[in-house]
């Protein structure tokens, strides 16, 4: 990859340099997703069978995975992998449990009590991709916080393999996390099924999970139409690395490739004030690429990625906050000393021995993160993502006497007479 000198770019060129490859959804993709959603809305299970046969190449009589199939999944997964999944799930639970939101109660004035109650979303839908690779880790990342939140019903959709079955490790993850129902459905059609409901698939209140451009577009369209709530815009994976001259080139190359291998639409960026470091990373990339089973996919992603030379690390953080990466790696001598400069990122990885892959799997943080610049306004999935916050207030007779005058003044200033009257009647001062 060519090294770009940030200081040599004008404003337009700088903006172009930070443009994501999948930032603009092609018109044909948008129209295709709209058609798929409408087909599922009108045709239900029949439409799902037709679409699954068309895109996945399998004819399914039923979509739901049986209890027996879920139980059998454990025997199909190697003991070593089972143990790793159980260990990862425990760490994910420990981190997410520590950050859970609690009810609270405050007396805001004498005789006036305000509360916030935390309640689980009744039925949630989880989407677990299985396109270029079945991401059973995503089932852990979504299933654990859903269980901690107390959701009554957790529905999981994942694409079928060529034999019509779901990946055994995905099924095991679903079982480990207490998912209540699993369906072998993928793509935009799975999102539409969870949003509208069919004879087989229940209607969900909120849909979670990453996916390809079709999945992301389906989530966006259905959310914008008010059909279903979604977690966040979650598209192609991305990583931005800020490195100084002391960083390890081999480590950085490995981290860049771990994102690039996700798919050809992934993006990786390296920002550094050291030409020598970036040249060394380029050499390490070439060497490590030769050893990857998904080298061709990684090469396609690297083709639209960027190495950016900055004059100072302060500039690197300004660029990073503007880009708002899904993953931000600080390969710096004192990474924690720079953490206060981070204003927008999905998840941050500090130092040489915190590869992004740890967060993907088993450090405990969630890997379902905002992409495409959404980290400027969205956060990664947490237990709160699966909950509603309900406010409650109670005023006694003395309480309304205490604060009623304030409400009257504000209501009358806004010209809302009925609001004012509702307060005045209770204060015994209605005209």
UniProtKB/Swiss-Prot annotation:
Its EC number is 1.1.1.23. The keyword Ion transport does not apply. Zn(2+) binds at residues 259, 262, 360, 419. Binds 1 zinc ion per subunit. Its cofactor is Zn(2+). InterPro entries: Ald_DH/histidinol_DH, Histidinol_DH_CS, Histidinol_DH_monofunct, Hstdl_DH. GO terms for biological process: L-histidine biosynthetic process. One of its GO terms (molecular function) is zinc ion binding. The active site is at 326 (proton acceptor), 327 (proton acceptor). One of its GO terms (cellular component) is cytosol. Pathway: Amino-acid biosynthesis; L-histidine biosynthesis; L-histidine from 5-phospho-alpha-D-ribose 1-diphosphate: step 9/9. Substrate binds at residues 237, 259, 262, 327, 360, 414, 419. It comes from the Bacteria. Keywords: Amino-acid biosynthesis, Histidine biosynthesis, Metal-binding, NAD, Oxidoreductase, Zinc. It catalyses: L-histidinol + 2 NAD(+) + H2O = L-histidine + 2 NADH + 3 H(+). Catalyzes the sequential NAD-dependent oxidations of L-histidinol to L-histidinaldehyde and then to L-histidine. Belongs to the histidinol dehydrogenase family. This is Histidinol dehydrogenase. It comes from Xylella fastidiosa (strain Temecula1 / ATCC 700964).
């Amino acid at each position: 990859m060519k090294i770009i000198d940030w200081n040599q770019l004008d404003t337009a060129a700088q903006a172009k340099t930070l443009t994501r490859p999948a930032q603009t959804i092609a018109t044909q993709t948008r129209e295709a997703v709209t058609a798929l959603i409408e087909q599922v809305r009108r045709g239900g299970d029949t439409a799902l069978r037709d679409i699954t046969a068309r895109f996945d190449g399998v004819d399914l009589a039923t979509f739901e995975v049986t209890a027996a199939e879920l139980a059998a999944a454990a025997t199909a997964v190697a003991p070593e992998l089972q143990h790793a999944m159980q260990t990862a799930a425990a760490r994910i639970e420990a981190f997410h449990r520590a950050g859970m939101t609690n009810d609270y109660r405050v007396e805001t004035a004498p005789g006036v009590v305000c509360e916030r109650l935390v309640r689980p979303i009744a039925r949630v839908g989880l989407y677990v991709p299985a396109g270029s690779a079945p991401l059973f880790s995503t089932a852990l990342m979504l299933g654990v916080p859903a269980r901690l939140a107390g959701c009554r019903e957790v529905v999981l959709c994942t694409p079928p393999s060529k034999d019509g079955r779901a990946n055994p490790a995905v099924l095991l993850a679903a079982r480990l996390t207490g998912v209540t129902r699993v369906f072998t459905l993928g793509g935009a059609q799975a999102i539409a099924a969870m949003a509208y409901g069919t004879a087989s698939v229940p209607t969900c209140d909120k849909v979670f999970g990453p996916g390809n451009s079709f999945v992301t577009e389906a989530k966006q369209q259905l959310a914008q139409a008010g059909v279903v709530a979604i977690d966040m815009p979650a598209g192609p994976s991305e990583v931005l690395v800020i490195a100084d001259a002391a960083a390890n080139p081999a480590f950085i190359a490995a981290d860049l490739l771990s994102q690039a291998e996700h798919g050809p639409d992934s993006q990786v960026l390296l920002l550094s004030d050291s030409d020598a470091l970036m040249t060394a990373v380029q050499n390490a990339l070439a060497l490590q690429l030769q050893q990857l089973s998904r080298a061709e996919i990684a090469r396609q992603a690297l083709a639209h990625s960027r190495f950016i030379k900055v004059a100072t690390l302060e500039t690197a953080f300004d660029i990073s906050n503007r880009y708002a990466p899904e993953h931000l790696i600080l390969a710096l001598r004192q990474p924690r000393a720079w953490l206060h400069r981070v204003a927008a990122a999905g998840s941050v990885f500090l130092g040489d021995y915190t590869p992004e892959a740890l967060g993907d799997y088993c450090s405990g943080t969630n890997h379902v993160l905002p992409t495409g610049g959404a980290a400027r306004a969205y956060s990664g999935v947490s237990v709160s993502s699966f909950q509603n916050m309900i406010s409650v207030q109670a005023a006694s007779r003395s309480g309304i006497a205490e604060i009623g005058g304030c409400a009257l003044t504000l209501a009358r200033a806004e010209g809302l007479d009925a609001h004012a009257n509702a307060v005045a009647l209770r204060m015994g001062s209605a005209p």
